[in-house]
């Protein structure tokens, strides 16, 4: 699906905006602080229920307003879908799909698979394992219908188990939680392993095009020892977990380790190379989704020119065009994106929260 229309009200510094969008490239050009990133963030929030620059809702709602309102119109091959999200200062959300309330944010996420590329996105590579788990879980969410429910239940059970660890004295007292936890943990780990194995060739091929000077490898670590049953790990580590008051092993400790020429990428690659690798991984993930499901990602790229020379920008642009996906790009100057423009693209100028085309 592509987002053909976007309505924004009281989001960041944007009082109101009504944008007719291209199904191809959409460029947002303006000075720093003009509001161009806020447009990207509004789109992201419409598909995730939260912003990507701040988790504090008060910073996202426009000054002295009580709530933000976002509406979008999605065009698929066979039908159009109207979506909406309202969120107030108390954090209460209302999700509307095709005129009916009571929907979940996860439904919006399913309707709008998107990839976000920002200057802060290096955390995928040099941040903690949780960022790479999120990368894997995005793929599992869009490929496995039961993943979100299983993942939500896993989080709930781990929270309950960790609370119980502060009170129990014998492992047998934990068995009611572990009886439910173990099959969920194994299922989620299986899905992650299958996804990482399935996308490995796509990641390797795309990374080879972007970074031919390096040999990159990807290995999934499930969060506990290989060839060992999770039930055995939990029972064996009970005393240690009780001392720590949290569960030290499991799918919540999984990682996707990425190495360049045998060394961690964060120790080997420059900032420009890390950005290329991040872009390559996001592209590979979107292309894998399209091949597996026929659905296309929506790409959000903030500050397109940063860290990339002309050749690398051209390579990224050509790969994005080849996906036939909808792309939103912010830039300080139109000169940075003019080579990407064609007869189907749209150029928006953003100034002090006002958007014109």
UniProtKB/Swiss-Prot annotation:
Q: What is its main location?
A: cytoplasm
Instruction: Please give the Pfam families that the UniProt record associates with this protein.
Output: SMC_N (PF02463)
Note the InterPro entries from the entry.
Answer: DNA-binding_RecF, DNA-binding_RecF_CS, P-loop_NTPase, RecF/RecN/SMC_N, RecF_2
Q: Which residues, if any, are the signal sequence? A: none
* Example GO BP: DNA synthesis involved in DNA repair
Q: Name one GO cellular component term.
A: cytoplasm
Q: Which UniProt keywords apply?
A: ATP-binding, Cytoplasm, DNA damage, DNA repair, DNA replication, DNA-binding, Nucleotide-binding, SOS response
Where does the UniProt annotation locate this protein?
A: Cytoplasm
Q: What molecular functions are annotated in GO for this chain?
A: ATP binding; single-stranded DNA binding
Q: Where does ATP bind?
A: 30-37
* UniProt xrefs under Gene3D superfamilies: P-loop containing nucleotide triphosphate hydrolases, RecF/RecN/SMC, N-terminal domain
Question: Family, per the entry?
Answer: Belongs to the RecF family.
The record's section on PANTHER family has:
DNA REPLICATION AND REPAIR PROTEIN RECF
- What task does this protein carry out? The RecF protein is involved in DNA metabolism; it is required for DNA replication and normal SOS inducibility. RecF binds preferentially to single-stranded, linear DNA. It also seems to bind ATP.
Q: What protein name is recorded for this chain?
A: DNA replication and repair protein RecF
**What organism does the UniProt record list as the source?**
Escherichia coli O6:K15:H31 (strain 536 / UPEC)
């Amino acid at each position: 699906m592509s987002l053909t229309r976007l309505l924004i009200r009281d989001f960041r510094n944007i009082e109101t905006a009504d944008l007719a969008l291209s199904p191809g490239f959409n460029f947002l050009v303006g000075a720093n602080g003009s509001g161009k990133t806020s447009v990207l963030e509004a789109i992201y929030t419409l598909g995730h229920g939260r912003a990507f620059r701040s988790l504090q809702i008060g910073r996202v709602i426009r000054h002295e307003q009580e709530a933000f309102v976002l509406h979008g119109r999605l065009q698929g091959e066979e039908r159009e879908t109207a979506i909406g999200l309202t969120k107030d200062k108390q954090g209460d959300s209302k999700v509307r799909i095709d005129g009916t309330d009571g929907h979940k944010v996860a439904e919006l996420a399913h309707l709008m698979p998107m990839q976000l590329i920002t200057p802060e996105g290096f955390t995928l590579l040099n941040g903690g394992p949780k960022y790479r788990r999120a990368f894997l879980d995005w793929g599992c969410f869009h490929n496995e219908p039961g993943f979100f429910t299983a993942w939500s239940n896993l989080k709930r059970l781990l929270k309950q188990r960790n609370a119980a660890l502060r009170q129990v004295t014998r492992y047998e007292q934990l068995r009611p939680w572990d009886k439910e936890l173990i099959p969920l943990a194994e299922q989620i780990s299986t899905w992650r392993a299958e996804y990482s194995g399935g996308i490995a060739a796509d990641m390797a091929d795309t990374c080879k095009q972007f970074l031919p000077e390096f040999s990159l490898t990807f290995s999934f670590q499930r969060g506990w020892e290989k060839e060992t049953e999770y039930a055995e790990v939990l029972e064996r580590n009970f005393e240690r977990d009780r001392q720590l008051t949290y569960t030290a092993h499991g799918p919540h400790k999984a990682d996707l380790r990425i190495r360049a020429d045998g060394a961690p990428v964060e120790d080997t690659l420059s900032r420009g190379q890390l950005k290329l690798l991040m872009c390559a991984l996001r592209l590979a993930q979107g292309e894998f989704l399209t091949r597996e499901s026929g659905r296309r990602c929506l790409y959000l790229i903030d500050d397109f020119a940063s860290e990339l020379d002309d050749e690398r920008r051209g390579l990224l642009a050509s790969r994005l065009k080849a996906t036939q996906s909808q792309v939103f790009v912010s830039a300080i100057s139109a000169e940075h994106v003019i080579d990407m423009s064609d007869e189907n693209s749209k150029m928006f100028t953003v100034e002090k929260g006002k958007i014109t085309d």
